[in-house]
Curated annotation (Swiss-Prot):
GO terms for cellular component: cytosol; DNA helicase complex. Gene3D superfamilies: 3.90.320.10, 6.10.250.2380, P-loop containing nucleotide triphosphate hydrolases (3.40.50.300). Heterodimer of AddA and AddB/RexB. ATP binds at residues 33-40. Its EC number is 3.1.-.-, 5.6.2.4. This is ATP-dependent helicase/nuclease subunit A. Pfam families: PDDEXK_1, UvrD-helicase, UvrD_C. One of its GO terms (molecular function) is ATP hydrolysis activity. It catalyses: Couples ATP hydrolysis with the unwinding of duplex DNA by translocating in the 3'-5' direction; ATP + H2O = ADP + phosphate + H(+). It comes from Bacillus anthracis.
Length: 1241
């Protein structure tokens, strides 16, 4: 097959593996593309090669390309389009390439959800869904679930003799609520939807608990836990072996050897039992007996070695003790009874899940909405049907897609889930050896398990496929990295060769997986990777875990700030590919990567204190903003005024303006009852003189509140919000505060949220407040995000997840000492895709609870998956760096931690012992033991090579490993000597001494004047209208300059509009009609009315503006001589914008600056017509004339001509400059009286 593939062109930039990935065909292909290996370029090139293949070209719409994000899909289309356009330059006559460009926009290059949507839109009639369905908002979805679940549970509570249900409630709810039960039902529903057949998966959960006629050996949980037992016994054996080696040293405790050998024999017996059966291990564990250590005279031996030997033996004994207590303290049949007892309860739970799913789907169907999981399942429903044996097989529709698609290409395949895999399977060929599926990804970068991505799908194929593709699929490794320096790649390899393996990590980091250098860089200074471990001494630690975390963030932030500042100030150089040269590093070249963002605010604050520009998209704090918080309390009070805290907050806010004393006075009027009841009672009585002001404030607010409550029952929520903004004046008030524009923007966002809410299936204020509560419960608060330009010179802070796919010259990975998040393992119930459901055994009657076999197995499995995921997250972080990688972590006691990390230092294999890797609680627990086996850590450890193999100790990588004392970081910076005298003088308020030679310099600076003062009092950009006003202002009048700086009249916000339009708004409406009136149709009342109605529908006019249009005046214009010329003209242009440069003295009568200065002039010409003999310019005016001038139009004419002469002259200049043709005539048309003025120069 290889011989039939096109050969790589001479001088090609593609590597052999990349070229193979571009041209290989004839079977399913899996490309394992390491970080920075150019996978997107390969994918695009493969598509192009298929499209322009001379022998067998494929139309682009016969390819299905699945991407992870919409942005990736658009980028793919853009790249393919650009590549096709390049081909067209070389082959301008190619109709095939032109056809591909026209097909590209409708090609199936999209996310999996977009493809699902395309299938559903085409075959909706095969489903019970409204073809006009919409995608549900996530919060709306959550509220619907809540509503459905509440109804189901209410029904269950009302059923008599519902014994099993009430047992379920007793076991899994508290005295106060059934929230835990609701969480269980929702979690099971969500997990089931990640499987192609949700009901089948749920049924398997129940079947696993049906242990009738089974032994413990038949349980999948026991089989898995036995593997874990072997793992822990092996760990114990390693401890004893290590202790034996130490005891055999010349000054080791030799009398311990006999006991240690007995320990090894005991552990060997247990391990042999574990290889047999659960029952065998149980029996062996009951007979465990450790020999007592013989007394020795410690002074005869090396005391440190004795301690190490005893410590290792105790660790081994603890491993066995832990197994005894967790797994083998109960008889096997006791575990089986747990399953029997829980089976009917779990069966009832699963029944509730199925009922919930059915009703939830029905409610969404009634509301014409679907969610993203529905898209996948509906698509799968269309593409599959059930075979006779109950399995899923391709439907007729799926077979049509198989025939249509010549190839299916999947990007980021490592992030695919089970349902998506089934969809892909049904639209591709059955046989892997003759398949048409091309998959690209890197399982080492699969970091979305929390979104139900399944890296096992990639791993399964990677193990099954071969590099030759014989008898099945083909795998291709793209290991060359074209992003990073050797130091970054070698440093990453050195760590991952030691920590990532199949048993712990799910992936073998072997020779194929290693990163290989593909980029070339000039020689650089200080490019070694670094590990900076900060020692946080006990004296520094603030009381409490939260305080300690804050301090760790501060320590690491200060260290990073010092390093960034030093690198920038010293001119540290990075390579610039655009100029092919080294350049000084800039702030934008740095990124700080964090596992999550809680530390980001402290890091930002510290960097800002050091004068370092920094940006982080915190995406939090919106609902904590004062103005939003106050408004939310207003709406809570409108919904239910009996809530004391929201009402007190509103009364105390600037809206009502009560002070603490007034609030206390009000409360004193009624010590019982709610604030609202007390306020109502207070307002009914006559106030005392000293309470009159309080009474007036409360009466004003009380009346508003009653009006709002009435309004809320009848009108839309968004209208209510604008009503509150307008009637309280709060929107205008916050605009006058510091950061006023931002505050107003926050209030507008709240209004937008309300409109989004009203676009869902929910209505009403109460539900909106619940909607917001759910957003906050899910942690979906919004931040004041801003668009950040790629070239903006700031240090970026982001999560490792956000950084995926990005690259930066200098990367700090911080927070490496923070513990992994294991909260999911602590839940009362656990779910797993393979092992199903596990929870504690709870007997409410006996009031006992304990861990079950299923819970132990699932917890262990989830922990190993979490460890593997965290390894992959660390891999993503380290591979973002192009030139310099700096790792930072903080520990409480570096000496104690180093002792732990050094345990495996002399391990003889590349891969660290399983227990070291599986027992890690933070990234440092992997990084430090790895680096402490490298020669570059010698200066820190002073231990020598010992028995570390040469290939590890001398591995070709450069590292700087340093322990930093936290005290030095927290110490205030020393004050420079030359500043001391100045500081003392300022403290004592004395005159500051000044050297005489600097007096003149200081005087000159204080008396300096800007040389272009004239320019500062005139704008550099003007509109024609502003220039016209400048000419109209009286020569030399005192207020001429003030008029120039007067704020322009702004359009009124809609929420503040009163009935009727202003003169300016009427004029705008008339101009809009004159711009859009159809000159090809007869100008009649009926036709103009029809056209104006159309403008309202298109939102070109409001209804109010349309009502104010005097149609007869528009008709009068077209009946006039000038109007008839417009209708008969060769061409007519309306609302023509222009920009031109104009001499400053022409724009400003009072200009006294230098000649030759220019300003930018902008304007819009109402109408220009081209006739046989030239161009005529027309400006429409809605000025009031009739009745305003005693002498009528004749008196008005010279005044109006003077008023608008400058404006029309500038219009004419602009036209003549742009058209290179003189304007023959300039006309003003006044609608009031149907008058025309021809303006002469």
């Amino acid at each position: 097959m290889m011989e039939n593939w096109p050969k790589k062109p001479e001088g090609s930039q593609w590597t052999d593996d990349q070229w193979k990935a571009v041209v290989a065909t004839g079977r399913d292909i899996l490309v394992a593309a390491a970080a920075g290996s150019g996978k997107t370029a390969v994918l695009v090139e493969r598509i192009i090669k298929k499209i322009i293949n001379e022998e067998n070209p494929v139309d682009v719409d016969r390819l299905l390309v699945v991407t992870f994000t919409n942005a990736a899909a658009q980028e793919m289309k853009n790249r393919i389009g650009e590549a096709l356009e390049k081909v067209l330059i070389d082959e301008p006559g190619s109709q095939h390439v032109r056809k591909q460009l026209s097909l590209l926009n409708k090609a199936s290059i999209s996310t999996i959800h977009s493809f699902c949507l395309q299938v559903i839109r085409g075959y909706y009639y095969m489903l019970d869904v409204d073809p006009r369905f919409r995608i549900a908002n996530q919060t709306e979805n959550e509220l619907l679930k809540e509503e459905v679940l509440d109804d189901i549970l209410e029904e269950e509570y009302g059923i008599e003799d519902n014994t099993i249900f009430f047992e379920l409630v007793d076991r899994y709810t508290s005295d106060r609520s059934d929230d835990d039960l609701q969480r269980m039902i929702l979690a099971l529903h969500t997990e089931s939807r990640a499987h192609p057949n949700p009901e089948k998966w749920l049924d398997k959960l129940v079947e696993a608990y049906d242990v009738e006629g089974k032994t413990i050996e038949d349980l999948v949980y026991a089989s898995y836990l036995l593997e874990d037992v072997k793992f822990q016994l092996e760990t114990a054996e390693q401890h004893i072996r290590k202790a034996t080696e130490l005891a055999m040293l010349p000054d080791g405790p030799a009398p311990r050897i006999e006991t240690l050998q007995a320990d090894l024999a005991l552990l060997g017996t247990l391990s042999a039992a574990a290889r047999e059966s659960w029952t065998s291990v149980y029996e062996a564990m009951q007979n465990v007996s450790w020999q007592t250590l013989k007394r020795i005279k410690k002074s005869d031996y090396n005391e440190d070695i004795v301690k190490q030997v005893d410590s290792l033996r105790n660790k081994a004994k603890d491993e066995v003790k832990k197994l005894q207590e967790e797994l083998f303290s109960r008889r096997p049949e006791s575990f089986l009874r747990d399953f029997q007892d829980m089976h009917p309860v779990l069966e009832k739970l699963v029944q509730l899940v199925k009922v919930f799913t059915e009703r939830f789907q029905a409610m969404k169907r009634d509301k014409g909405m679907v969610d993203f999981t529905d898209l996948e399942h509906f698509c799968l429903q269309i593409l599959s049907e059930q075979s006779e044996d109950g399995e899923m097989k391709p439907s007729a529709v799926a077979l049509q897609y198989r025939n249509k698609f010549a190839e299916v290409l999947v990007d980021e395949y490592q992030d695919t889930n089970f349902v998506q895999e089934s969809i892909i399977k049904f639209v591709t060929k059955d046989s892997e050896s003759e398949g048409n599926l091309f998959m690209v990804g890197d399982v080492k970068q699969s970091i979305y398990r929390f979104r139900l991505a399944e890296p096992g799908l990639f791993l399964g194929k990677y193990k099954r496929f071969t590099q030759e593709g014989l008898g099945g699929g083909m795998k291709i490794d793209l290991a060359k990295n074209f992003r990073s320096r050797h130091e970054v790649l070698a440093g990453t390899n050195f760590i991952f060769k030691q920590i990532m393996g199949e048993e712990v990590g799910e992936i073998d980091y072997d020779a194929d997986a290693e990163l290989k250098l593909g980029a070339s860089y000039p020689e650089g200074e200080d490019v070694a990777a670094e590990l900076l471990c900060i020692q946080q001494t006990e004296e520094e630690v603030i009381d409490g875990e939260e305080g300690a975390e804050v301090e760790k963030a501060q320590l690491e932030a200060r260290l990073m700030a010092q390093r960034i500042k030093a690198m920038v100030d010293s001119g540290y150089e990075v390579y610039d590919r655009k100029t092919d040269s080294m350049r000084p590093v800039k702030y934008r070249d740095f990124v700080i990567l964090l596992r999550s963002m809680p530390w980001a605010p402290q890091i930002m604050e510290e960097l800002k204190l050091q004068g370092i520009p920094v940006y982080a998209d915190l995406a939090t704090g919106y609902f904590e903003a004062t103005e939003v918080n106050i408004m939310m309390n207003v709406f809570r009070v409108i919904d239910n005024p009996m809530q004391d805290i929201p009402l007190a907050a509103v009364l105390r806010s600037p809206i009502v303006g009560l002070n603490d004393e007034e609030l206390a006075t009000l409360r004193a009027h009624g010590k019982k009852g709610s604030f609202y009841e007390v306020m109502s009672s207070f307002l009914k009585g006559a106030p005392l003189e000293e309470e009159k002001e309080l009474h007036d404030k409360l009466e004003w607010f009380y009346n508003l509140l009653q009006g709002w409550r009435e309004f809320a029952r009848q009108q839309s929520l968004s209208d209510l919000i604008w009503k509150v903004y307008g009637e309280t004046g709060y929107y205008d008030f916050v605009g006058g505060l510091p950061a006023g524009k931002q505050r107003q923007a926050n209030l507008r966002v709240l209004y937008d949220r309300a409109r989004q809410y009203e676009a869902t299936s929910f209505r009403g204020l109460f539900r909106f407040l619940r909607f917001i509560e759910r957003i906050l419960e899910r942690g979906d608060d919004m931040g004041t995000a801003r668009a950040l330009g790629e070239q903006e010179d700031v240090v970026r802070i982001m999560t490792i997840h956000k950084s995926k796919g990005l690259e930066f010259p200098v990367v700090f990975v911080a927070g490496l000492g923070r513990r992994f998040n294991t909260q999911d393992l602590m839940k009362r119930f656990l779910l797993h895709k393979d092992f199903g459901f596990g929870s504690q055994f709870i007997d409410p009657r006996k009031r006992i609870k304990y861990t079950t076999l299923s819970q132990l197995a699932i917890k262990r499995k989830m922990k190993m998956e979490l460890i593997a995921e965290e390894m992959r997250v660390l891999y993503v972080a380290l591979t973002r760096a192009k030139e310099k990688l700096i790792l930072i972590g903080t520990v409480k006691d570096a000496t104690k931690e180093m002792e732990k990390w050094l345990d495996a230092r002399e391990h003889s294999e590349w891969l660290l012992p399983d227990h070291v890797r599986a027992g890690a609680s933070c990234y440092l627990d992997w990084i430090a033991p790895s680096l402490y086996r490298h020669r570059d850590s010698e200066m820190l450890l002073e231990l020598g090579q010992g028995s570390i193999p040469d290939e590890i100790y001398g591995y070709d990588t450069s590292w700087k490993v340093e322990v930093v004392d936290g005290n030095t970081l927290l110490a205030p910076e020393p004050v420079q000597e030359e500043k001391q005298e100045l500081l003392e003088a300022l403290r004592e308020k004395k005159a500051v001494p000044l050297e005489s030679e600097r007096k003149e310099e200081v005087y000159d600076r204080l008396m300096w004047k800007y040389g272009y003062g004239e320019a500062t009092s005139h704008r550099a950009k003007q509109s024609v209208t502003e220039i016209k006003r400048n000419y109209q202002s009286e020569e030399g009048s005192d207020n001429a300059f003030i008029k120039k700086l007067r704020a322009p009249i702004q359009t009124r916000p809609r929420f503040m509009e009163k009935k009727g339009l202003t003169y300016a708004e009427r004029g705008t409406a008339v101009h809009a009609v004159m711009q859009h009136v159809d000159l090809k149709k007869p100008i009649t009342v009926e036709i103009l009315q029809e056209q104006i109605a159309g403008m309202v529908n298109k939102e070109l006019l409001t209804f109010e503006q349309a009502e104010e249009i005097a149609i007869e005046k528009v008709i009068s214009f077209f009946d006039s001589d000038l109007g008839k010329r417009v209708l008969a003209a060769k061409s007519v242009e309306r609302e023509v914008p222009f920009t031109m440069m104009l001499a400053a003295e022409e724009a400003y009568q009072d200009w006294q600056g230098e000649s030759g200065e220019s300003i930018l002039v902008q304007g819009v010409i109402d109408c220009m017509i081209e006739e046989e003999d030239g161009i005529t310019l027309i400006d429409f005016k809605t000025d009031t004339i009739e009745g305003k001038f005693p002498g009528g139009f004749e008196q008005a004419k010279p005044i109006l001509e003077t008023r608008y002469k400058v404006q029309l002259s500038l219009y004419a200049k602009a036209l003549e400059k742009s058209l290179q043709h003189p304007v023959k005539e300039k006309c003003l048309y006044f609608f009031d009286g149907n008058h025309v003025i021809k303006v002469e120069e």
